[in-house]
Amino acid sequence: SYAMTGWRIGYAAANEQIAKVMSNYLSHSTAAPCSIAQKAAVEALIGPQDTVDTMTSAFEARRDHLVERMNRIPGVSCLKPEGAFYIMMNLEQLVGKTLHGVFIRDADDFADAFLKHGLVATVPCTGFGAPNFVRWSYATSLQNIDEGLNRLEKFLAE
């Protein structure tokens, strides 16, 4: 849309009772978004929407390319996300193996080894309750995505 990921701002339509519960939860779990994010969100809602379609199409193309290509790499897989800017790469088949001298117990081990030896940063999903998954962002160019996938193939082959 307006590329405001990470700003932690949004809105919801709910009945009064649910809205009250949501408000109570938010007031105890997080502070209000900064004033700049609030103003930007208003402008994104009332501003031109043609760029939203353009950006959505670009993200879909990168997502589809990443998913299709990753699912051809032996040892890893991913599902096609419906509303994110990243995929969750399943590395369950790599758990218990040694890659570049590193015994892979979970996503943390994989992410550390891949960063050190493949020079690609991924986010381990251990903290999200998914110890056999790492996140790959597709909020970048197709060229960068392909370079990352090329490095993954090389990393897994050596």
Model-found features: residue ranges?
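PLP-dependent class I/II
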Residues: 1-158
